[in-house]
A protein has these predicted regions:
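Metal-coordinating catalytic core of metallo-dependent amide/deamination hydrolases
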Residues: 39-173
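Divalent metal-binding segments
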Residues: 1-41, 109-119
């Protein structure tokens, strides 16, 4: 990940989107949560616009690195202020709530194991203030369930509900 550039991100997104369109897909979503070397969600949104694919981009994030009890390496994390500020910027720049719009943006902390409880709550408040969707990965393995029970004394579903991460504007992977 340390060598990925904005151009590489744009080209790889363009190729993937072209393959999707060739198979008949007209709408896709992507959960981008790594931003090395100046990469931004804009790089994938630009690819979707160039290709002509309807795109639901989600501004992912990881703020809780290994040194603080999270799963991702510290080098892949961002400050929570930067995450929330960039999520607002991307929503304001690109989100189109109109029916049949070509670009929508959601807020998507990577998982409860890679961000703080504070960021999960703030991300939900931010998304709802803009009327955009919320996305995260939740209970993908028995290890995820064990982590949630050990760290939060709750199942992943109970934890998500306690943080306001349930409802018609939320989708979990």
């Amino acid at each position: 990940w340390a060598r990925i550039t904005p151009e590489m991100l744009n080209v790889s997104a363009s190729v993937a989107m072209a393959e999707l369109m060739l198979s008949g897909c007209t709408t896709a979503s992507d959960h981008l949560y790594l931003f090395p070397n100046g990469c931004r969600l804009d790089d994938t949104i630009d690819a979707a616009r160039e290709i002509g694919l309807r795109f639901h981009a989600t501004r992912g994030a990881m703020s809780l690195g290994e040194s603080r009890g999270g799963l991702p390496p510290d080098a892949l994390t961002e400050s929570e202020d930067d995450i929330l500020r960039d999520a607002s910027r991307v929503i304001e720049a690109y989100h189109d709530p109109a029916r049949f719009s070509m670009v929508r943006v959601g807020v998507a902390p990577c998982s409860p194991f890679s961000v703080t409880e504070h960021l999960m709550r703030e991300a939900a408040l931010l998304a709802r203030s803009y009327g955009v969707g919320l996305h995260t990965h939740l209970a993908e393995s028995v290890n995820d369930v064990a982590f949630s029970r050990e760290k939060y004394n709750r199942t992943p579903a109970e934890y998500a509900e306690a943080l306001g991460w349930t409802g018609p504007d939320v989708w979990h992977a």
